[in-house]
């Protein structure tokens, strides 16, 4: 029974996508909505059953569906592998996806492309489920690339908008750059292990770590580094994060799905799944810790200066992913996945609440909003719960999972603990920035827009109850019932930790355990003080019409410009990569047009045309001309024979 349910969990979203996609022109909109939401809801319910068997009871479900690749001794089967890690990912992916599908029925109700949209959402979910249930690297890569293609389709869903098309292309190309490293990593694995199956590769980890290729670097270090670069692109870590804010051009439900439980978490999942490899590569683990710690602070600092509500939450996602990678870097994979699961619920709640606000006021700039708490009390409550969970306030989910990460970072002696604490303060500040500017103060909306602002339809608000429940209880369940914060807890059979005893014997002092929430409360107070004044320190250009404090000092302006322009990453990449490539492309274009085409196909065609024109002029229609041609030909022939002989 469990095997059949496991197959249905993955195939139901695919069936939904295929039915709605193939019969796009003929299927009734209501029927398409029922199929999409019904199939995804069934998938979510079945994932609960699988969680009870594979997750709670620890039974591994391994189904070999069919042979896929067979070349000599190299064999890969198309399989489904479900253990404790996969089962918890099933819960996060299917439940958040189901809520997003239902929410979309209201949000996209007036959009003519809603059936196409639902088809893309379902396909996205299928590829993510395929990714997390793979038992080999090639099948994982299939799901990995699948979510990349679907993100391109969803970000650019409104293809008539030039900005949406550019954002989709940017996301696609950025991920292709990182995926190139990922492909090289998989190829290296196959070359050195002779297999792509997890079991075979993981059993070779220690041997690979002893195979030195340059100084102290082993082939395993190279493999792990290449795999992690792939993760950096997919999970928007510093340097490869530039696609993330632009991805907000897609419909808001897309943002909730991509940035909560699916595509961006794939990188964290991969590092956790490959813990058997990474544990034997301490150099790469240190690199992961640094990248994660720097990203969580870097992205949080950018979020402070943003004014677009969706971009603030997007950079928040980037920051929280940094926390997850920091946990993996200090070998606390369990804490990283724990935060991944809790984050899926409260981040989806924040995105969909933002969608309700945008749907009501048709505006994304939080500095143009205000005083909406009485107009939209349910949305206000949802946003507040999501924000407090993100900050890590007891007893909400983020309190348990984020604290687990910071405690592990402290116990490992990593300096990134300081970065994590600093990011926690900034997280509280930008979360309060949204709450105070959107729901409090004097509204800056036009009078008729403000008067007509209201709660969205029940079909949009009702499913958010599940996310509210997840934001409240997922942390408690994970901490008290499943012991996800402990390396020998829920994930002890799925994740590998070479030095598990170090984490087990470490007991951070009480003040370290309380510090994250303390700095979170401090950040809340700062946020309220800064954004609740009649003279808001808005950190906006001086051209804005609403009040701001007197001109700041040059150092402040410098910091403001750096953060407001997102550390100039886009400008740097444009100068170093985009412009040189465009110049090279122009050079090749000129070479193609002026040289190859001119003297090649176009030149040859011009010669033929010229010859045909000259030949055509000989066809005068006069008999005496033709007689002249014949006589001339005879004279030439006779002359040749005479000359030769």
Swiss-Prot record:
It catalyses: a quinone + NADH + 5 H(+)(in) = a quinol + NAD(+) + 4 H(+)(out). GO terms for cellular component: plasma membrane. Keywords: Cell membrane, Membrane, NAD, Quinone, Translocase, Transmembrane, Transmembrane helix. InterPro entries: NADHpl_OxRdtase_5_subgr, ND/Mrp_TM, NU5C-like, Proton_antipo_N. It holds the Pfam family Proton_antipo_M. Gene3D superfamilies: 1.20.5.2700. Its main location: membrane. The chain crosses the membrane at residues 7-27, 31-51, 88-108, 114-134, 137-157, 177-197, 213-233, 252-272, 284-304, 312-332, 337-357, 380-400, 415-435, 464-484, 510-530, 623-643. Belongs to the complex I subunit 5 family. NDH-1 shuttles electrons from NADH, via FMN and iron-sulfur (Fe-S) centers, to quinones in the respiratory chain. Couples the redox reaction to proton translocation (for every two electrons transferred, four hydrogen ions are translocated across the cytoplasmic membrane), and thus conserves the redox energy in a proton gradient. This is NADH-quinone oxidoreductase subunit L. It comes from Rickettsia felis (strain ATCC VR-1525 / URRWXCal2).
């Amino acid at each position: 029974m469990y095997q059949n349910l496991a197959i249905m969990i993955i195939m139901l979203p695919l069936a939904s996508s295929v039915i709605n996609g193939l019969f796009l022109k003929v299927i009734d909109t209501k029927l398409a909505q029922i199929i999409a939401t019904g199939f995804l809801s069934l998938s979510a319910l079945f994932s609960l059953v699988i969680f009870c068997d594979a997750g709670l009871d620890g039974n591994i479900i391994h189904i070999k569906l069919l042979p896929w690749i067979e070349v000599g001794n190299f064999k890969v089967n198309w399989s489904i592998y479900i253990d404790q890690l996969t089962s918890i990912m099933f819960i996060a992916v299917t439940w958040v996806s189901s809520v997003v599908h239902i929410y979309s029925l209201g949000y996209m109700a007036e959009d003519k492309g809603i059936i196409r949209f639902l088809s893309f959402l379902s396909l996205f979910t299928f590829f993510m489920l395929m990714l997390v249930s793979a038992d080999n690297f090639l099948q994982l890569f299939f799901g990995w690339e699948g979510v990349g293609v679907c993100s391109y389709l969803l970000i650019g869903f409104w293809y008539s908008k030039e900005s949406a098309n550019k954002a989709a292309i940017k996301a696609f190309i950025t991920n292709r750059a990182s995926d190139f490293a990922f492909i090289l990593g998989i190829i290296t694995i196959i070359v050195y292990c002779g297999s792509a199956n997890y079991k075979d590769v993981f059993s070779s980890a220690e041997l690979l770590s002893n195979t030195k290729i340059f100084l102290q670097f082993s082939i395993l270090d190279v493999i792990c580094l290449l795999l992690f670069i792939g993760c950096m692109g997919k999970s928007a870590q510093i340097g490869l994060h530039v696609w993330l804010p632009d991805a907000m051009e897609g419909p808001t439900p897309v943002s909730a799905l991509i940035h909560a439980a699916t595509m961006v978490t794939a990188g964290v999942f991969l590092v956790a799944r490959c813990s058997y490899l990474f544990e034997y590569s301490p150099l790469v683990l240190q690199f992961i810790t640094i990248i994660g710690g720097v990203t969580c602070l870097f992205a949080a600092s950018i979020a402070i200066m943003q004014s677009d509500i969706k971009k603030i939450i997007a950079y928040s996602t980037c920051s929280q992913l940094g926390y997850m990678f920091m946990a993996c870097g200090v070998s606390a994979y369990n804490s990283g996945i724990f935060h991944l699961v809790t984050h899926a619920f409260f981040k989806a709640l924040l995105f969909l609440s933002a969608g309700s606000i945008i749907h009501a006021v048709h505006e994304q700039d939080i500095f143009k909003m205000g005083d909406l708490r009485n107009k939209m009390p349910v949305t206000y409550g949802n946003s507040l719960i999501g924000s407090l969970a993100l900050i890590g306030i007891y007893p909400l989910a983020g309190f348990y999972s984020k604290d687990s990460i910071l405690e592990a970072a402290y116990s490992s002696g990593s300096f990134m603990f300081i970065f994590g604490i600093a990011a926690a303060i900034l997280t509280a500040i930008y979360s309060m920035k949204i709450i105070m500017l959107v729901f409090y103060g004097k509204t800056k909306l036009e009078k008729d827009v403000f008067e007509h602002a209201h709660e969205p339809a029940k079909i949009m608000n009702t499913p958010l109850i599940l996310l509210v429940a997840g934001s409240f209880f997922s942390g408690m369940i994970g901490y008290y019932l499943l012991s996800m914060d402990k390396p020998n807890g829920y994930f002890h059979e799925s994740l590998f930790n070479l030095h598990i005893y170090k984490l087990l014997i470490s007991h951070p002092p009480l003040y370290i355990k309380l510090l994250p929430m303390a700095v979170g409360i401090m950040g809340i107070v700062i946020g309220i003080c800064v954004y609740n004044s009649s003279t808001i320190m808005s950190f906006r250009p001086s051209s804005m019409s609403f009040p701001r404090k007197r001109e700041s000092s040059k150092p402040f302006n410098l910091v403001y410009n750096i953060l407001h322009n997102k550390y100039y990453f886009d400008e740097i990449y444009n100068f170093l990569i985009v412009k040189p490539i465009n110049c090279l492309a122009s050079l090749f274009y000129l070479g193609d047009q002026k040289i190859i085409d001119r003297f090649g196909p176009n030149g040859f065609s011009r010669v033929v045309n010229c010859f045909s024109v000259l030949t055509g002029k000989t066809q005068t229609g006069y008999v005496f001309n033709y007689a002249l041609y014949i006589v001339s030909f005879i004279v030439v022939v006779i002359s040749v024979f005479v000359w030769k002989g």
